[in-house]
């Protein structure tokens, strides 16, 4: 996987609370077993009408956000069923980071396992991001994973975030769980050589 050290991107603002996994990826699209293609149906029922026409008022249909790698959402994102497909859809669409003031635990773990960084911020900082993007849709955020800081480049406001040390190392090195173990192989072998049974 690609290493994640820093990211600067415009953001997609979705100031809706309690977005559940069925809204992220409706159940009728869960039949596929490959992770690819799920991005096409991310927020499907909000993006398209019953005739499959794009709903112009929905934020993902605004061309100004086509290159955005950061999704900013309301509180309690990813609640509902534990479907990993929700994380697949977000990753396949191209998002690298999701920011909220609270995530459902299972979604948060699924996101990290699919190399999407879920970052928890204060309600105050979240509101400031939405306000900045409302004033200027080209507002960018910089995610500094090494120092665990989010920088709102429009206002220069900073917010520290917390991340599990193991997951942080995986993101910084582009490792999944297997890659992490393989990287430690020499230490494991050294331990086995020196271990007295």
Swiss-Prot record:
Enzyme Commission code(s) on record: 4.2.1.33
GO process terms (BP): L-leucine biosynthetic process
Amino-acid biosynthesis as UniProt keyword: yes
Main EC class the enzyme belongs to: lyase
InterPro entries recorded: 3-IsopropMal_deHydase_ssu, Aconitase/3IPM_dehydase_swvl, AconitaseA/IPMdHydase_ssu_swvl, IPMI_Swivel, LeuD
Gene3D superfamilies referenced in this protein's UniProt entry, alphabetically: Aconitase, domain 4
UniProt xrefs under Pfam families: Aconitase_C
SUPFAM superfamilies assigned to the protein according to its UniProt record, in alphabetical order: LeuD/IlvD-like (SSF52016)
Protein family membership: Belongs to the LeuD family. LeuD type 1 subfamily.
Subunit structure: Heterodimer of LeuC and LeuD.
PANTHER family: 3-ISOPROPYLMALATE DEHYDRATASE SMALL SUBUNIT, 3-ISOPROPYLMALATE DEHYDRATASE SMALL SUBUNIT 2-RELATED-RELATED
Name used for this protein in its record: 3-isopropylmalate dehydratase small subunit
Source organism per UniProt: Azobacteroides pseudotrichonymphae genomovar. CFP2
